[in-house]
Amino acid sequence: MPLLDSFKVDHTRMHAPAVRVAKTMTTPKGDTITVFDLRFCIPNKEILPEKGIHTLEHLFAGFMRDHLNGNGVEIIDISPMGCRTGFYMSLIGTPSEQQVADAWLASMQDVGNVKDQSKIPELNEYQCGTYQMHSLAEAQQIAQNVLARKVAVNKNEELTLDEGLLNA
């Protein structure tokens, strides 16, 4: 099985919250797709609570589109990482890490401004596979944490995993 790019970076050196360009690729038609690692937590030291990350998934996707889409950028998908330390965001275009960080911070402000659980989009059994597993309070605590700590940039060249550790 091929080793995925996400496992070629040293998770012990990652900062959080931080944005990282995880991958770029060009489609056959010439569009650039960029995948960003939006790391909310320091790997193996912090973890996002399941209800909070789920609620954040519902809110973050819309808010990031509000703040980042346009001028050659269109978000394809924002999905939580299985390890619950962040999200991957795939988009068409090549925004800078700073543009992504600014949109992320603005989105966290938006999460903090959601008044009650009834305002969470798609929060029903028809549009959500686990619609009862949500917590606006947890999502807002995650957002507050990001706002308090700010968003750094994780650079791939600083996180390259030593070859000797690849299958440790």
UniProtKB/Swiss-Prot annotation:
Assembly notes: Homodimer.
Concerning InterPro entries, the annotation shows: LuxS_sf, Metalloenz_LuxS/M16, S-ribosylhomocysteinase
Report any Pfam family annotated for this entry.
LuxS
Query: Where does the UniProt annotation place the signal sequence?
Result: none
Organism of this sequence: Neisseria meningitidis serogroup C / serotype 2a (strain ATCC 700532 / DSM 15464 / FAM18)
Look up the EC number in the record and give it.
Answer: 4.4.1.21
Q: Which cofactor does it need?
A: Fe cation
Reactions catalysed according to its record? S-(5-deoxy-D-ribos-5-yl)-L-homocysteine = (S)-4,5-dihydroxypentane-2,3-dione + L-homocysteine
**Gene Ontology BP annotations:** quorum sensing
Q: What family is reported?
A: Belongs to the LuxS family.
Name by which UniProt lists this protein: S-ribosylhomocysteine lyase
The regions listed as transmembrane in this protein's record are none
The main enzyme category here is: lyase
| Organism superkingdom | Bacteria
Co-factor: note? Binds 1 Fe cation per subunit.
Q: Which UniProt keywords apply?
A: Autoinducer synthesis, Iron, Lyase, Metal-binding, Quorum sensing
A GO molecular function term, named singly, is: iron ion binding
Its biological function? Involved in the synthesis of autoinducer 2 (AI-2) which is secreted by bacteria and is used to communicate both the cell density and the metabolic potential of the environment. The regulation of gene expression in response to changes in cell density is called quorum sensing. Catalyzes the transformation of S-ribosylhomocysteine (RHC) to homocysteine (HC) and 4,5-dihydroxy-2,3-pentadione (DPD).
Residues binding Fe cation are: 54, 58, 128
